[in-house]
């Protein structure tokens, strides 16, 4: 198949593109030729503008509709996997317009250009987020996809909900073949320690005391990068029409507080120092709990995580401790 993947300079995108190529698919992407954020591998080469072997490159910005439209019209993909996004919730509080431009306008441009220019598109797979659930009553956990109102608790969440609503509108109005993944907090990064698990590991292996962390009380679900990658590959290669128009939780469904998460990582890294909690300002609207049910992914995709949270933590820590 011909698969258009955005975000190939990101945490998941490069490895996903390489995996799909190894499966015999033809891959294209849109890039500004400047890597930003996290890279799963080969960071320096991506910054220098070197390319992934076997990927066809179109150059431009996702926020430029004409650039997006021309690329999709030329490539005519069977499947689009839209990963490109500004991924930091914290960043969204201080850079609202940038986050909305990338995380909503980028989705609008990709999907509308695909609807108009790619008549034989089979699937448009988009990365939503657990953040879309926001603050829910305790009895709602673990949250399922179809029986809850979404509540944004950050500018990031607002943009994600807007994007999902737009895609679902296209599906209902025009039969647009979208698939929405509501992803748990992902981890397994090899070149960035700006997210919670990698930050804790990085600080602990430095051996300094105290390490500085934020609020210890929020409870979160996580998903290990190889398991998240599997979900995208399975959705891309699926022939099932049941997944079209659906939102699907991608998570290990192993909720853990940040305090307990840090304690688990301390065991793995043999850290015995102090943790200085609440070292950073709290979010304007903190979500106390994000815990999702993954039964729909098992039922519709045949997907389930191959790694427990603890197994993923051990593998990630082992990489950083090399």
Q: What role is predicted for each listed range?
A:
Residues 162, 166, 170, 200, ...:
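Hydrophobic alpha-helix immediately C-terminal to the catalytic Tyr-X-X-X-Lys motif of short-chain
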Residues 19, 205-322:
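C-terminal substrate-binding subdomain of Rossmann-fold SDR/epimerase-dehydratase oxidoreductases
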Residues 125, 132-138, 175, 191, ...:
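Proline-centered turn/helix-capping motifs that create local helix->coil transitions or kinks
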Residues 69, 73, 115, 168, ...:
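Solvent-exposed, non-membrane alpha-helical residues enriched in polar/charged side chains
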Residues 1-186:
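N-terminal Rossmann-like NAD(P)+-binding domain of SDR-like oxidoreductases, especially those catalyzing
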Residues 66, 78, 90, 97, ...:
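Residues in well-ordered alpha-helical elements
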Residues 138-141, 193-203:
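A glycine/serine/threonine-rich, flexible loop-to-helix segment
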């Amino acid at each position: 198949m011909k698969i258009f993947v955005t975000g190939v300079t990101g945490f998941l995108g490069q490895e996903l593109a390489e995996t799909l190529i190894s499966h015999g698919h033809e891959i294209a992407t849109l890039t500004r030729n400047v890597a930003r954020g996290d890279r799963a591998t080969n960071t320096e080469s991506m910054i220098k503008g070197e390319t992934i072997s076997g990927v066809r490159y179109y150059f431009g910005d996702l926020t430029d509709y004409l650039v997006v439209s021309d690329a999709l019209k030329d490539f005519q993909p069977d499947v689009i996997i839209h990963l490109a996004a500004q991924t930091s919730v914290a960043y969204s509080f201080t850079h609202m317009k940038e986050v909305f431009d990338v995380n909503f306008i980028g989705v609008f441009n990709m999907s509308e250009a695909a609807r108009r220019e790619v008549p034989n598109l089979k699937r448009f797979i988009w990365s939503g987020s657990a953040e879309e659930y926001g603050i829910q009553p305790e009895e709602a956990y673990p949250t399922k996809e179809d029986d809850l109102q979404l509540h944004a608790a950050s500018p990031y969440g607002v943009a994600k909900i807007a994007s999902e609503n737009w895609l679902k509108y296209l599906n209902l109005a025009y039969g647009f073949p979208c698939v929405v993944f509501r992803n748990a907090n992902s981890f397994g990064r090899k070149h960035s320690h700006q997210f919670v698990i990698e930050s804790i590991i990085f600080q602990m292996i430095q051996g300094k005391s105290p390490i500085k962390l934020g609020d210890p009380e929020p409870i979160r679900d996580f998903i290990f990068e190889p398991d998240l990658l599997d979900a995208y590959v399975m959705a891309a290669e699926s022939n099932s029409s049941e997944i079209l128009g659906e939102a699907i939780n991608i998570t290990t469904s192993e909720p853990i507080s940040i305090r307990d998460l840090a304690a688990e990582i301390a065991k793995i890294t043999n850290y015995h120092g102090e943790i200085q909690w609440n070292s950073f300002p709290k979010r304007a609207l903190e979500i106390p709990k994000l815990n999702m049910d993954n039964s729909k992914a098992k039922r519709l995709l045949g997907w389930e995580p191959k790694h427990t949270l603890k197994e993923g933590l051990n593998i990630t820590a082992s990489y950083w401790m090399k």
